[in-house]
Design a protein with these regions (language model features):
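N-terminal [4Fe-4S]-dependent radical SAM core
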Residues: 88-95, 112-156, 204
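Conserved non-cysteine loop/helix-boundary elements of the Radical SAM core domain that shape
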Residues: 173-368
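A C-terminal junction/extension of Radical SAM enzymes
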Residues: 28-34, 346-421
Length: 465
C-alpha cells in the first residue's frame, strides 16, 4: 500500500517514522493521489481524515507548559496514524506507536510522575504485552544504578578512528591510514581538552561517576598515542572506566596492560559475529580465532568484558546468528549486547540497498538471543531503538548480576550530565528538577576540531557554568 501523509503541523518527520515502521507493507509516495492521510491539529484537537472518514481526539493539555503540550499532541497524532496503519495492514508492531530511541526513559518519567507506566504503554501507546513486559523488566533491573544527581557527571571521550570501515557503520569515523598527519595533533588536543574538563569538574564541585572512551575504535591508535589519553583519564577518580576496545585486530597485550595500569574496569571486545564468512563480507579484518585469542589475553587482566553481536547481518541465517550467540555465551563475559541491524544513511549497506526486512527472521533471532542469554544468568539492563531497524525491534544490553554498565544506563535514561571530549563528542547538561537537558556538540571532522581548539574549550566552559 502506497501512502501520502499531509499535515498542518510541524510533526511530519515524526509521522513519517510511523509509516516507515510498517514497511514493506506500507510505502511513502509523495505523488500518491488516492491514499492520502490528512492529520490536522487545532488547539487541543487532532483530526485524522482518510477515505472520507474523519476521526477526532482531544488532548488534555490545558494545564501543561507549551513544550509539553506540543509533545502530547505529537504523541496523539502518531497513535492515531498507528491505529489506522495497523487496521489497514493487520500488523501490530513490537513497540506499538513508539518510534523514539529511549522507551525506558519515558517509562521512568511516567512512573516518577505517579502514573501506571505499564498500563499507559499498553492502553495508550499500543505497546503489546510482550514489549511492555520487556521495558518494565529493564527498568526494574536498573534499580540501584538509575538515579538523578546533578552533583555527578559522566565523562565521554571520542576517538573517531578505525583501521577500516565496516559495511554497516554510519558513524563519522576516519580510517587510520587516511589521517596519519592529524593523529599526533589530535591526541595532543584531546589530552588538553581532558585536562580542561577535569579543571571544570573541580570548579563546578561535581564528582565523576563514570568514564567511557568510544569511537570509532580507540584501540586503533598506536600504543604511545593510546597511552597518552588513557593515562590522563586514569588520573580521574570514578566508579567505572570503560574503553570500547572493539575490534580484536586492534587489541594488543601492551594496550591491555596500559588500560589495566590506568584503572580501566571494563572493556568491549566486539565480534559482531563469529562467522568468518560474514566477518570478511562486512569488512572486518580478523577471524573468529582472533576473537578467541584476544579474549583469552584480556582474561589475564581484571576487566569486566562486554561483547557485541548484530542480528541480521548480510547473508546470515538464523543458524549463523544462533552460533554467534552460543559462542558468546560460552566465553562467559560479564556483558553481552545484542544489536538489531539498522540500515543507516552513510553506511555501505545503505548504498548497496541491502534489505534487512526479511519477514519474521529478525524476531526469531532476537527471541532466541533473549531466551538463551537470560537462561545463562544474564539480565537485560538497558535498551535503545533506532530508525530503520530490522523488525522494528531494539538493541539490548545484558549483564550478569552486579555487572551492569553505569554509563550505558546514564546515557540512555539521560539522568546525568556528560562532559564530552574529542571530535564529534556531544556534551549534555541535565537539570533533574526541571526535567531539562541541553546539548553541546564538538565539530565532527578531526580537521575542524583541530582548527577550533580555543573556541571548543571556551564554549564548554560557558555551557557548564
Amino acid at each position: 500500500m502506497e501512502l501520502k501523509v499531509v499535515t498542518n503541523s510541524e510533526f511530519l518527520p515524526d509521522l513519517m517514522d510511523v509509516v516507515r515502521a510498517f514497511s514493506p507493507l506500507v510505502a511513502i509516495d509523495e505523488n500518491e493521489q488516492k491514499n492520502i492521510v490528512y492529520i490536522e491539529i487545532d488547539n487541543d484537537t487532532v483530526a485524522l481524515k482518510f477515505n472520507q472518514k474523519t476521526i477526532e481526539n482531544r488532548c488534555e493539555i490545558q494545564n501543561l507548559p507549551p513544550i509539553k503540550q506540543k509533545s502530547e499532541l505529537k504523541r496523539l497524532a502518531k497513535i492515531m496514524l498507528y491505529d489506522l496503519l495497523a487496521e489497514c495492514t493487520g500488523k501490530r508492531l513490537p513497540y506499538g506507536s513508539l518510534t523514539g530511541i529511549r522507551p525506558t526513559k519515558l517509562y521512568h518519567e511516567l512512573t516518577e510522575s505517579g502514573k501506571d507506566a505499564k498500563n499507559y504503554f499498553k492502553e495508550y501507546l499500543r505497546v503489546p504485552q510482550q514489549g511492555a513486559d520487556w521495558i518494565e523488566r529493564i527498568c526494574d533491573n536498573q534499580k540501584g544504578i538509575y538515579s538523578h544527581n546533578d552533583k555527578q557527571v559522566d565523562f565521554f571521550v571520542n576517538i573517531p578512528i578505525c583501521v577500516s570501515r565496516c559495511s554497516y557503520c554510519s558513524f563519522i569515523s576516519a580510517e587510520l591510514g587516511k589521517i596519519k598527519k592529524w593523529l599526533a595533533p589530535y591526541v595532543g588536543q584531546v589530552v588538553r581538552e581532558i585536562k580542561h574538563s577535569v579543571a571544570l569538574v573541580e570548579i563546578l564541585g561535581v564528582q565523576v561517576r563514570s568514564i567511557y572512551v568510544g569511537g570509532g575504535t580507540p584501540t586503533s591508535l598506536c600504543e604511545k598515542d593510546f597511552e597518552q589519553i588513557i593515562a590522563e583519564l586514569g588520573k580521574i577518580k570514578c566508579k567505572e572506566f570503560t574503553v570500547e576496545a572493539g575490534r580484536p585486530d586492534t587489541i594488543s597485550k601492551e594496550k591491555l596492560k596500559i588500560m589495566s595500569d590506568n584503572g580501566v574496569t571494563r572493556i568491549s571486545i566486539n565480534p559482531q559475529t563469529f562467522n568468518d564468512k560474514t566477518l570478511a563480507l562486512i569488512g572486518r579484518n580478523h577471524t573468529k580465532q582472533d576473537i578467541f585469542k584476544v579474549y583469552d589475553m584480556a582474561r589475564e587482566f581484571d576487566f569486566d568484558i562486554n561483547m557485541d553481536l548484530i542480528a541480521m547481518l548480510p547473508n546470515e541465517s538464523f543458524e549463523d546468528f544462533k552460533y554467534s550467540v552460543d559462542q558468546a555465551i560460552a566465553l562467559n563475559p560479564e556483558n553481552i549486547t545484542i544489536h538489531t541491524l539498522a540500515i543507516k544513511k552513510g553506511s555501505n549497506l545503505k548504498l548497496q540497498e541491502y534489505d534487512n526486512k526479511i519477514e519474521l527472521l529478525p524476531e526469531k533471532m532476537i527471541e532466541y538471543s533473549r531466551n538463551a542469554i537470560i537462561s545463562n544468568g544474564f539480565e537485560p539492563y538497558y535498551m535503545y531503538r533506532q530508525k530503520y531497524m530490522s523488525g522494528n525491534l531494539e538493541n539490548t544490553g545484558y549483564a550478569k548480576q552486579n555487572k551492569a554498565c553505569i554509563y550505558n544506563i546514564d546515557i540512555m535514561e539521560e539522568t546525568h550530565s556528560i562532559i564530552a571530549c574529542g571530535a564529534g563528542a556531544i556534551s549534555k547538561r541535565v537539570w533533574s528538577e526541571q526535567n531539562r537537558l541541553e546539548r553541546l556538540a564538538n565539530p565532527k571532522g578531526i580537521d575542524v576540531y583541530l582548527e577550533r581548539e580555543e573556541k571548543i574549550l571556551a564554549d564548554k566552559e560557558n555551557f557548564f557554568k
